[in-house]
Amino acid sequence: MTSKTLILICNQFPFGRGETFISNEFNYLHSAFDKVVILSRTDETVQTRQIPNDVELFKISPKSNLLQKIKFLFILVSNRQRVKRLLKHEESSVYSIFKKPATDSQKRKMKHDLFKALEIKNYIEKKIIPKTGTNVIVYSYWQNSSALSGILLKEDKLCNQAISRAHRGDLYFDVQ
């Protein structure tokens, strides 16, 4: 029997002061999986919350340095059809919701989020999947580029399932 692994992608947990609700559900997650991996998108260095010793913790900076931007160009070139398809889908989603084309600002945000999603997906594919195998559920605490990275991993059959928590701002456009 293969072991079940959870990859939890969050912005700070177990660092910093945010994402306090993860603390409340973490014991349930930990007991439901054979292995738990946390990928925290933070530059924080001080761990403020305790996690069990058997949980693997990875960090990826939310900021992109020059080397990451250069790497992204290679990722972008090798995924250009996928990028084109995803951006077209995003633009059509904006049109279906707002009944007008995406603004330049929205298009820049879409490209940035896709860049970050590909960066996170690439990190998980290269650094975490070799240690865990693909019997994995990716759980993004936020519906942002982290959630999109889970979808990309699922499309590439590198995980069994990709899920994301929905917060009020994800559901209601008047709350941002």
Regions inferred by a protein language model and the residue ranges of each:
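N-terminal subdomain of nucleotide-sugar transferases
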Residues: 1-70, 131-134, 160
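A short, histidine- and acid-enriched strand-loop-helix "catalytic/donor-clamping" loop
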Residues: 12-16, 144-147, 156, 160-176
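A short acidic, amphipathic alpha-helical/loop segment
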Residues: 21-25, 149-153, 176
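Membrane-proximal helix-turn-helix segments that form the acceptor-binding/catalytic region
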Residues: 25-28, 125, 133, 161, ...
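Active-site catalytic microenvironments for nucleophilic, acid-base chemistry
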Residues: 32, 153-156
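A conserved catalytic-core segment of Leloir-type glycosyltransferases
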Residues: 45-115
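Short, well-ordered alpha-helical microsegments
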Residues: 45-46, 146-150
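Short N-terminal targeting/anchoring amphipathic segment
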Residues: 96-98, 108-117, 121-145, 163
